[in-house]
Amino acid sequence: MLQRDVFVDQLKGYACLLVLLGHVLLGLISCGLSLPAFLPFSERFIMSFHIDLFMFLAGYVYHLTGDAASKGSRLRFIGNKLLNLGLPYFFFSAVYIAINSLTPGVNTASSLSDILQLWRQPVAQYWFLFSLFWLFVFWALLSRFFNNITITAVLFTVFTVLKYLNIDLGFLDSSMHCVLAFGLGTCLRSLAVQKLPAAARIAAILLPILIVSALFLT
C-alpha cells in the first residue's frame, strides 16, 4: 500500500489558506476602501503562485500514484477523472448558476442557459476542476508516446508559441496556462526537501523571492 505523503497534505493546506487570504484581500481592495499600501502587493504576491502550487501538487501526486497506468488503462483513468472531477464540476457549477441567476444584485450575473455552456466555458472558481481534468487527459494520452519531461516541454512550448502568435486557445486556455506547474510536478520524484543539495534548497527559497520582487517592486 502506498504510504500517504504528509508533507504534500500540509502544502495543500497552506495553499488553501493562501487562496482564502488572497480572495479576502481581493474583496477588500475591490470595495474601494482606504487600505495600507502593502495589502495590494500582498494580494498580487499570493495570486502570482497559489494556483500554480495546487497544480504542481496535483502533478506530483499524479506521478506518485502511478501516472495514467494507475487505473489499469488510460481510458479507465480518464473515466475515473470524469467521475471524480467532471460530476462535481457540472453539479456545483449548475447550482451556482441557478442561484446566481435568481439572485438580484450579484457582482456577476448569470443566466440558466449558461448551464448548457459548461462543457466549454467554466464559471467562477469551478474553472479549476475543469482545467485539472483536461490536464489529466493531456498527460494520459501523451504518456503513451512520451515521458513526463517531454510532455511538459512540448505542451509548454506549444502554449508559449500560440500565445506569442495571439492564437485563441478556446476552452483549453485555462488548462494550458497551468501545464508548466502541473508538468513540473509530474517530473519530480520526491518532495523530501532534506534530500536536496544545500545549494538547491537555498535557490528554491531565493529565486521565487527575486522573481516576485522584480515583477512587483520595480
PLM features per residue range, with description:
Residues 51-64, 130-141, 165-197:
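Specific transmembrane alpha-helix
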Residues 197-218:
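Alpha-helical transmembrane segments and terminal signal-anchor/GPI-anchor hydrophobic tails
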Residues 6-66, 85-93:
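Functionally critical transmembrane alpha-helices in membrane proteins and complexes, commonly lining
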Residues 39-51, 116-130, 164-183, 215-218:
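Interfacial loop-to-helix transition and helix-capping segments at the boundaries
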Residues 44-53, 65-100, 107-124, 131, ...:
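Transmembrane alpha-helical segments and their boundary/interface "anchor" motifs
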